[in-house]
């Protein structure tokens, strides 16, 4: 009625951190690193540096050949949610106008735990998605959508060599001292303008499709989460 296009949510996702458990365990045992250290963004940066240095030490005759530990699928989620965790909205909308909140100290924290470790080789983004980088052995862990879990590899392939791997699933990290806020994202459907009969039929379908039983079947097949709270319990 107001000329706007609305999307009706049919599937949801959030973010998680997934780890190549098979290659994580030798590193963790050798360095005393724990999974709990990955609970914060700063902790991941510290662990990634430690992993880079540990892998570099494995070849003392070859300097500066440490390996990246981590990557992220969505830079925008990192900045938007990271700022929110630290108590600020990076995009503030009022009366239809958007203001960019560039708090220098907070942006610096985000920069130091994203761009800096990428430049130093502690993080890496080489393939289209970070699950691709896990498969090629270029990283050990990544933060990405829950819907990407189905693509997490069961083997690592490096050249002509391949070996099976297991995995660990953790919460996505929180900025140190920040609020535990996670991203909410997902897919939706729209009903386009046509005639009353088709519009009504489409609305009935969407209502049926998002009911608990139907929606659960759909999201289990598509690796998403249901849109109704009752279906998540």
Task: Describe each model-derived feature in a short phrase.
Residues 39-43, 123-136:
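Short helix-initiation/N-cap motifs at beta->coil->alpha
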Residues 146-163:
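A ligand-binding cleft/hinge motif common to bilobed small-molecule-binding domains
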Residues 33-37, 62-64, 69, 88-109, ...:
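Short, solvent-exposed loop/beta-turn-alpha elements that line the ligand-binding surface or hinge
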Residues 1-24, 168-182:
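A structural signal for short loop-to-beta-strand junctions that line the ligand-binding cleft
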Residues 140-145:
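Paired acidic/hydrophobic, glycine-rich loop segments that form the ligand-binding mouth/hinge
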Residues 45-52, 93-127, 172:
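Glycine-centered hinge/linker elements that transmit conformational signals in sensory
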Residues 108, 120, 158-232:
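Extracytoplasmic/periplasmic substrate-recognition and gating elements
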Residues 2-17, 42-99, 139:
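Extracytoplasmic/periplasmic solute-binding protein
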